[in-house]
Amino acid sequence: MSELPRGSTIRKDAGLYGYERALRRHGIEPIAGVDEAGRGACAGPLVAGAAILPPGKAGIVPGLADSKLLTERARERCYEQIVRRAVSWSVVVVSHEECDRLGMHVANVEALRRAVALLDLPPAYVLTDGFPVDGLGVPGLAVWKGDRVAACISAASVLAKVTRDRIMTELDASWPAYDFKTHKGYITEVHSAALTAHGPSPIHRMRFVNVRRAAGLEPLDPVQNGEEAVELVEVTEGTR
């Protein structure tokens, strides 16, 4: 990943489309944003989205913002606008089994790479949310709180979040005791109580401490397994 082109600046009041405008002033196009949903959940898949929005008014999505800041209804409205307006977009689903096999950080990076690779139009530049993603094959920039300040990342976050929420709602029909349709696999009091009462379902991620505890298993050794902290602590409601 790299920095913005020499001479580029982003004003704090540049708005949601400031990064894209700054890059286009240097002739950089197309610009993709990529983000994920479900990293902090202890059940269900990890989903990554990527989006390239057109320049100008055609790329302005009414109501677009970080998916976590939108209501479910608002996210659905934005989703429909994004798939209609985007020059190219993609969604990648990484199963809970693959998350367990790879570990969450590796699975997360792999999902983001796959989402960019699936775009019909290869991007010239990629904006990512929060941390750099190597192996994309093009220059890019990690943007702090990117899903709140860069439109293409916000669009990607909506694609990922809506897709994952729909999947978790469908999975709820198979395992209704866990109420996946409500908490989407994140830990809440209801989810914790269900884990205690029923043990893990087939779609729970067995690397998480609370899931292993419910299964009567010891936590994974972080040294032997190379796990990052997020996988070895109790996950709480509201994490990604």
Curated annotation (Swiss-Prot):
User: Which enzyme type, at the first EC level?
Assistant: hydrolase
Its BP terms in the Gene Ontology are: DNA replication, removal of RNA primer; mismatch repair
Keyword set for this entry?
Cytoplasm, Endonuclease, Hydrolase, Manganese, Metal-binding, Nuclease
Concerning InterPro entries, the annotation shows:
RNase_HII, RNase_HII/HIII, RNase_HII/HIII_dom, RNaseH-like_sf, RNaseH_sf
- Write out the GO cellular component annotations: cytoplasm; ribonuclease H2 complex
Q: How is the cofactor bound?
A: Manganese or magnesium. Binds 1 divalent metal ion per monomer in the absence of substrate. May bind a second metal ion after substrate binding.
Q: Which reaction does it catalyse?
A: Endonucleolytic cleavage to 5'-phosphomonoester
Q: Does the keyword Hydrolase apply?
A: yes
How is this protein named in the record? Ribonuclease HII
What organism is the protein native to?
Nocardioides sp. (strain ATCC BAA-499 / JS614)
The organism's taxonomy opens as: Bacteria, Bacillati, Actinomycetota, Actinomycetes, Propionibacteriales
UniProt lists the gene as rnhB
